[in-house]
Amino acid sequence: MSLILDHVSHVYGDDTALAVKALDDVSLEIPDGQFIGLIGHTGSGKSTLVQHLNGLIKATSGHIYFNGKDIDDNDFQKKELRSKVGLVFQYPEHQLFEADVFSDVCFGPKNLGLTKKEAELRAYEALKKVGLPDDLFYQSPFELSGGQKRRVAIAGVLAMKPEVLILDEPTAG
């Protein structure tokens, strides 16, 4: 398994007077089993780049390959990509939405088509991995501290058992 970016560029507002180039001819290979860090100033394109890795946004030009397949090919399954390339956003409170923590963490596995029992098992295991106490499982995620929200967001991605885990600004906040 690997992720390859081949001459990827991204322009927000392409073909408008307000066009802004966020990525310019980026080529990168992330082999299986590797840890990498992206460092750059605010506005340098780090978040834009990681959103390309699981197909949340489409490159203006260039190609992105996962396991040797171009993720923008018509027959490529984005749902499968998103189950294998998990993304925890910079602000975890933006990806929490269910009425309670446990339901929030179950959402991803259920969306993959797993049974309720399997989704719940994965959610329980993921919440344990991130060290969230059992007494918080049925509280609203919006009543948690910032650090607890971050743990819930990470657990939600871990419950999908991705092959690749992307953390956007993991130490922010």
Regions found by a protein language model. Name each.
Residues 39-41:
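The feature captures the beta-strand-to-loop junction immediately N-terminal to the Walker
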Residues 54:
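Helix-to-loop junction immediately C-terminal to a conserved catalytic motif
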Residues 62-73, 81:
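Conserved ABC transporter NBD signature motif
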Residues 117-135:
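Conserved ABC ATPase "signature" region
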Residues 140-144, 148:
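Conserved ABC ATPase signature
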Residues 161:
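Conserved catalytic motifs of ABC-family nucleotide-binding domains
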Residues 165-168:
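Catalytic Walker B motif of ABC-type/P-loop ATPase nucleotide-binding domains
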